[in-house]
């Protein structure tokens, strides 16, 4: 479940914020913070209260909440750039550089995730037209934070094949993709598990495809050829590549993700996105064009996916946007598909109700029973906030997988 970071009230709704107490941990930390500029203070006051409420609702202990809010202030707040944002990030519909989400799995503590694309005052300027200077500065900062198991070597291996070189950047002269205002090349995701932080990287090769004239699949193969453990994906990668090309699923929205850990242990994720997607196409995507129809794991996952689709899209066979990824594990025999139901701009109460029904369906009854009240508190901390009047909290909802993620 993904939640927005800044509220935008629907047309006709009151824009007056209800009176409510700020989260205690957030308030205590804020008193001791010394911001370098007004932008940092604004990013903190507009985003940190929501993160604080999400951490609390997900069952994080008070020390953990303090730890991760402090990390948020140290690592991300100084690297969101000017406020209001000038650099348009690809990670959110609105172009904001940050997004919060919660991952629920049976038998496990919920995991809060922070997706962000670093930005700065030079992002998009002649000094950093495609934001890579800023991204690399933040990568170096994460290296100095000594996250357990953090290893940026795979980032450095793949970046030259999937992102613009200095010469290519100069050649494009700040140009964007056709029909888009986004120029993102890299972004990060942080999984907050227990007391630990796991870093994920996302690379967006569309601009590299534009300037090189090479297809996404060609760039990906060239990048993985430099990966010392590329043979670990030798069985499963051809399945994904052949379907994505056959199904005409590679486009300017395609990107890749991987874990910033020892490269022999890192997952590889290949993302696709299509506009105006039907349930029939979702089935095709899930089974890689019938390549996995005999897989029991794939069949079980598709049944979950159909249930989620029905709860979030009752009576409809099409949605405006479809986003998915194929997760490739080292040495795996088949990819694990994950599909994200894009709920941007839809009624918050109907979305929350659909998710609640799905959680009941998969046996997360306790989580389901308290979910709507928790979501209501996300908006300014009001327990009974009228979600039927808002369309701001949800972006994407992914399916529960038949097995737990590693």
Curated annotation (Swiss-Prot):
Looking up InterPro entries in the UniProt record yields: Aro_prenylTrfase, Aro_prenylTrfase_DMATS, DMATS-type_fun
Q: Which residues bind brevianamide F?
A: 99, 204
Organism superkingdom: Eukaryota
What residue spans carry the Polar residues bias annotation?
Answer: 1-19
Report the pathway entry: Alkaloid biosynthesis
Q: For site (Required for regioselectivity), what residue positions does UniProt give? A: 115
Q: Which residues bind dimethylallyl diphosphate?
A: 113, 200, 202, 269, 271, 340
| CDD domains to which the protein is assigned, alphabetical | PT-DMATS_CymD
What EC designation does it have?
2.5.1.-
Top-level EC class as recorded in UniProt: transferase
**Molecular function GO terms recorded:** prenyltransferase activity
State the UniProt keywords alphabetically.
Answer: Alkaloid metabolism, Prenyltransferase, Transferase
Annotated GO biological process: alkaloid metabolic process
Residue ranges for the region (Disordered) are 1-23
What role does it play? Prenyltransferase; part of the gene cluster that mediates the biosynthesis of paraherquamide, a fungal indole alkaloid that belongs to a family of natural products containing a characteristic bicyclo[2.2.2]diazaoctane core. The first steps in the biosynthesis of paraherquamide is the production of the beta-methyl-proline precursor from L-isoleucine. They require oxidation of a terminally hydroxylated L-isoleucine to the corresponding aldehyde by enzymes which have still to be identified.
The record's section on NCBIfam families has: arom_pren_DMATS
Quote the PANTHER family the UniProt record gives: INDOLE PRENYLTRANSFERASE TDIB-RELATED (PTHR40627), PRENYLTRANSFERASE ASQH2-RELATED (PTHR40627:SF3)
**What is stated as this protein's family in its record?**
Belongs to the tryptophan dimethylallyltransferase family.
What name does this protein carry? Prenyltransferase phqJ
Please tell me the species this chain comes from.
Penicillium fellutanum
Phylogenetic lineage: Eukaryota, Fungi, Dikarya, Ascomycota, Pezizomycotina
